[in-house]
From Swiss-Prot:
Species of the source: Streptococcus gordonii (strain Challis / ATCC 35105 / BCRC 15272 / CH1 / DL1 / V288)
Function: One of several proteins that assist in the late maturation steps of the functional core of the 30S ribosomal subunit. Associates with free 30S ribosomal subunits (but not with 30S subunits that are part of 70S ribosomes or polysomes). Required for efficient processing of 16S rRNA. May interact with the 5'-terminal helix region of 16S rRNA.
Stated family: Belongs to the RbfA family.
Cytoplasm listed as a keyword: yes
Signal sequence residues: none
Name of the protein: Ribosome-binding factor A
SUPFAM superfamilies: Ribosome-binding factor A, RbfA
Length: 115
């Protein structure tokens, strides 16, 4: 049970650090406006699935952001290594967070019911 709390704590710390690294260290214009919404860790802390959103709804911007994040993965891992006190920094996988779009769709459906 205690391991579960550690996994959650490490995930929250990685989320905070990756957001900061994207704002201050990564200069790639493709990742401007990207916000990390969640990080899910494997139980052994070897892999982190990083969920992100981008302000634009355009598919081309989403694809550019994904490519920019994949390109910046090495820089992000290196900075995490400097900032976190962990034996091994987990491998990072970036995934577009669909929950906000889903929430907006549900919101629109509810508004349409009121009409």
């Amino acid at each position: 049970m205690a391991n579960h709390f550690r996994v959650d704590r490490v995930g929250m710390e990685i989320k905070r650090e990756v957001n900061e690294i994207l704002q201050k260290k990564v200069r790639d214009p493709r990742v401007q406006g990207v916000t990390i919404t969640d990080v899910q860790m494997l139980g052994d802390l070897s892999m982190a699935k990083v969920y992100y959103t981008i302000m634009s709804d355009l598919a081309s911007d989403n694809q550019k952001a994904q490519l920019g994040l994949e390109k910046a993965t090495g820089t992000i891992k290196r900075e995490l290594g400097h900032n976190l006190k962990m034996y091994k920094i987990p491998d990072l996988t970036f995934v577009k967070d669909q929950s906000i779009e889903y929430g907006n769709k549900i919101d629109q459906m509810l508004r349409d019911l009121d009409k």
